[in-house]
A protein has these predicted regions:
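Conserved Rossmann-fold cofactor-binding substructure of NAD(P)-dependent oxidoreductases
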Residues: 43-64
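NAD(P)-cofactor binding segment of oxidoreductase domains
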Residues: 61-105
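Conserved Rossmann-fold NAD(P)-dependent oxidoreductase catalytic core, especially the SDR/UDP-sugar
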Residues: 90-132
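Catalytic helix-loop patch of NAD(P)-dependent Rossmann-fold dehydrogenases
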Residues: 116-157
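Glycine/proline-rich active-site loop of Rossmann-fold NAD(P)-dependent oxidoreductases
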Residues: 137-140, 151-152, 164-173, 183, ...
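A conserved pocket-lining segment of Rossmann-fold NAD(P)-dependent short-chain dehydrogenase/reductase
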Residues: 173-193, 197
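Mid/C-terminal beta-alpha module of Rossmann-like enzyme folds, strongest
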Residues: 201, 208-258
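C-terminal amphipathic/interface module of NAD(P)-dependent oxidoreductases
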Residues: 260-296
């Protein structure tokens, strides 16, 4: 198994996969991130820019599974394109000379532009890229290129919701610091997924004896919830005032997610991936996941 972009999710995946018997190789542009994965020996840690070809000769085939968990390299939309488009293209060039059986790419639910709170499935991505946010357009192009690239005999895209878990506490840290105003629209739905449930989903996909034709699947928990509901529940548990939301405070990163001046607001359905793999999130809603974090 090769894990590209081995950061927050990748480190957890590497730990579980290594214990499960996989020979794991890990890649990141951040040496400190790789050093934290003690179960992977130094000779199997590759520090490099993914979009560069400089790392290609460090990894030889055959490879049972290549998983790209890369996140944006920063620098706005240009960083998005560098990470998600050029990074995947670099992996494809590398795979042309190696026997790579399976490729998994983690995209995001930002490819869904709906703003009306409706429930969406994998079929609800608009045909016209101009209907997507700038970030969504880049991710959708990356998805399309991967699904069409036959250099990988089997390929799959997982669209992840907002990631949280140990050390990554959406809203929780803000409330603990005493912040009482949060950027955004409180009535908009959040589609979350716990880090450990992502790891379980990736391994569930790899356990399938045969993959279906190339396709995208949503990996989110079972119960999308309004932002204000999540924040209020956390505030109650912490014993602090319930914060209010202010859309005018949205930063540049949030503005790149807007569609037609509005923030995304939809409830993402995970039924297709559950039916395919039998995966069930251990944390089916935000309460389950955050209760564990609060108790920890």
């Amino acid at each position: 198994m090769v894990i590209f972009g081995c950061g927050y999710v990748g480190r957890a995946l590497a730990e579980v996969a290594a214990v499960s018997g996989w020979e794991v190789w890990i890649h990141s542009r951040n040496a400190e991130s790789l050093a934290a994965v003690g179960v992977v020996p130094p000779e199997r840690r590759i520090v490099a820019d993914l979009h560069s070809d400089a790392w290609h000769d460090r990894l030889h085939g055959p490879v049972e599974a290549a998983i790209n968990l890369v996140s944006s390299a920063g620098n706005g939309l240009e960083g998005y394109e560098l990470s998600y488009l050029e990074g995947n293209r670099s992996i494809a060039r590398w795979a042309e000379k190696r026997a790579v059986r399976r490729f998994l790419f983690t995209s995001a639910t930002s490819v869904y532009p709906q703003t009306d709170g409706s429930r969406v499935t994998e079929a609800d991505v608009p045909a016209d890229p101009e209907d997507l946010s700038p970030n969504g357009r880049v991710l959708r192009q990356a998805e399309t290129e991967i699904l069409a690239n036959t250099v990988f005999p089997e390929r799959m895209v997982l669209r992840l919701g907002g990631i949280y878990g140990p050390g990554r506490h959406l809203y929780l840290d803000r409330l603990r610091k005493g912040e009482n105003v949060i950027p955004g629209e409180g009535g908009d739905f959040l589609n979350l997924v716990h880090r450990d449930d992502i790891v379980a989903a990736l391994l569930a996909a790899l356990r399938l004896r045969k993959w279906p034709p190339p396709a995208c699947y949503n990996v989110v928990d079972d119960a999308p919830a309004p932002k204000a509901e999540i924040a209020a529940w956390l505030a109650q548990r912490l014993g602090v005032p319930v914060p209010r939301f202010d859309p005018a405070l949205a930063g540049r990163r949030s503005r790149r997610r807007r569609i037609g001046g509005r923030f995304p607001n939809r409830r993402v359905d995970n039924g297709a991936f559950r039916d395919l793999t039998g995966w069930e999130p251990r944390h089916p809603d935000f309460r389950s996941g955050y209760q564990e974090l609060l108790e920890g």
